[in-house]
Amino acid sequence: MRVKTGTVRRRRHKKILKQAKGFYSGRRKHFRKAKEQLERSLVYAYRDRKQKKREFRKLWITRINAACRLNDISYSRFIHGLSKAGIELDRKILADMAMNEPEAFKAVVEKAKAAL
């Protein structure tokens, strides 16, 4: 006996179309296009979750470097000075400190300079 996919297909299609909400034009309305775009979107999402970490690290380093140069030291010498001084602050914290608390950052820079 032949089995038709009636409700199963509808459920499967609805699931894909629900996830495609917010896509443009036929990529939201047509099952095949929606499925293809959704697959692509998930690939982008996976890739960009990895890239996000790299991008933020780059941003933090840029901010720290700018703040270091205002205090007459290069980024690399500053990081070397921190490790020699035994100060274990990560780049996220240092970048935040450089942006929001320049006086505290200056004190850290002075300790790093003294350790060199």
Curated annotation (Swiss-Prot):
Please give the Pfam families that the UniProt record associates with this protein. Answer: Ribosomal_L20
GO BP term, example: translation
Keywords recorded for this protein, A-Z: Ribonucleoprotein, Ribosomal protein, RNA-binding, rRNA-binding
Molecular function (GO) terms listed? rRNA binding; structural constituent of ribosome
Cellular component terms per the entry's GO annotation: ribonucleoprotein complex; ribosome
InterPro entries assigned: Ribosomal_bL20, RIBOSOMAL_L20_CS, Ribosomal_protein_bL20_C
Role according to the record: Binds directly to 23S ribosomal RNA and is necessary for the in vitro assembly process of the 50S ribosomal subunit. It is not involved in the protein synthesizing functions of that subunit.
The entry assigns this protein to a family as follows: Belongs to the bacterial ribosomal protein bL20 family.
Q: Under what name is this protein listed?
A: Large ribosomal subunit protein bL20
Annotated gene: rplT
